[in-house]
Amino acid sequence: MTSTEGILAGKYPAKAHARRVVEYLRQNGFEGDGVLYLEAQKTKMIEDNDSEQPFRQRRFFFYLSGCLLPDAHLTYHISSDKLALFIPPLDPESVIWSGLPLSPTQAKELYDVDEVLYTTDINPTLAHLASEVGTSGFVFAIDGQISDDISFKNFPETDLVALKTAIEECRVVKDAYEVAMIRKANDVTAQAHVAVLKATKSATNERELEAAFIGTCIAHGCREMAYHPIVASGTSSATLHYVNNDEPLIDLTTNKKKLNLLLDAAGEYKTYCADVTRTFPLSGKFSPESRQIYDIVLEMQTKSLAMLKEGVLWEDVHVTAHRVAIKGLLKLGILRGSEEELLEKRISVAFFPHGLGHYLGMDTHDTGGHANYADKDKMFRYLRVRGKLPAGSVITVEPGVYFCRFIIEPYLKDSELSKYIDADVLEKYWEVGGVRIEDNIHITKEGYDNLTTAPKTADQLELMINGS
């Protein structure tokens, strides 16, 4: 049994997470006793339909329970260190359609909780806990995630803000179980990326490759996608979050395959996400221009990865990626001027407009990054993580170079900025579209662990497409 499989054979560490959240509350001024209260996502019906909407568990609830059941509740009593899960009781009317639900005994075996009760017991339990916490005790819950029939009236104090913040901040640093979940999602995602590479030669439409990806993920245990797959062929790859996924892989004007396909797609394993991007030649061989850009982006990532360890300032890593892009585009003649002047004028933002990466966990764009979307410096405006990276965090490293007319043409029309871009040389690169390479990185005290195993070098990608 592998290390990942061995870790995942155990229970999700819900109680450890509850204790971590309480410690955060204590560090931020909370004293005394109290109760944490959270609700699972409710069963919801499709509007004008008798079918249920696809279910996605609330991440705050899962973090303190490890439970994927809808319509559940939990309480954590701080002073007694007791975590209780409340699950829906058996509904005889639904058994003939859906089978028997999980029993309290079964739930107790599955989840890292001290007690499992039915949801009909939640208000009596809250009333009892209110009597236990004393005259200055708190109940912590999340505004907007409290059912109308839930009563906190017996608690001296109610806080609907602090718990959400505490969980968001605690989620940044992952424990071994969480890292194993992300690694598992990455392992399945890598198999799906390989399946797409192998299907490329015979496919005629983006949707065929999307189907190959999703089918492989489901077959290997990731029934949900971490996000809507991006399967962008040709110049559509210059659109950062292209989602149509239904264009032909043939350029109808030349009757030849488009140059490249950008595949940004990943599976989700029991709420934990991967987030992986690869860009590869649809013909099985990079064009000279595509290979030049691919090599620049790969170097952007390689130089960024070399900087990673506990305490590194993420803004510094982001700037390093821009410096590599500038140097590479200067060498190709696309940019003109000095490296420092191009950096100062933020010219590289025209080709690399997004941030270098984001935290990853139960959400693809995970919590705790403290982005500043109002930043007046356009190089940092879309940087989703600001500040130093702690050991235990998981972050994406996803540099890219894009030839997007919507973004670049305003630079070409600007009398001041246009002098830094050679439009004649640029003309050769529009068909490249966009190149992005994205891996998922676990930060350690001395360095990092790359959780992503999908083929990445240009030679590997070409060999895989060509059946080697």
Swiss-Prot record:
Binds 2 manganese ions per subunit. SMART domains: AMP_N. GO terms for biological process: proteolysis. Keywords: Aminopeptidase, Hydrolase, Manganese, Metal-binding, Metalloprotease, Protease. Its cofactor is Mn(2+). GO terms for molecular function: manganese ion binding; metalloaminopeptidase activity. Mn(2+) 1 binds at D275, E398, E438. It comes from Talaromyces stipitatus (strain ATCC 10500 / CBS 375.48 / QM 6759 / NRRL 1006). This is Probable Xaa-Pro aminopeptidase pepP. Belongs to the peptidase M24B family. It is an enzyme of class 3 (hydrolase). It holds the Pfam family Peptidase_M24. Its EC number is 3.4.11.9. Transmembrane segments: none annotated. It catalyses: Release of any N-terminal amino acid, including proline, that is linked to proline, even from a dipeptide or tripeptide. InterPro entries: Aminopep_P_N, Creatin/AminoP/Spt16_N, Creatinase/aminopeptidase-like, Pept_M24, X-Pro_dipept-like. PANTHER family: XAA-PRO AMINOPEPTIDASE 3, XAA-PRO DIPEPTIDASE. Catalyzes the removal of a penultimate prolyl residue from the N-termini of peptides. Disulfide bonds: none annotated. Coiled coil: none annotated. Mn(2+) 2 binds at D264, D275, E438.
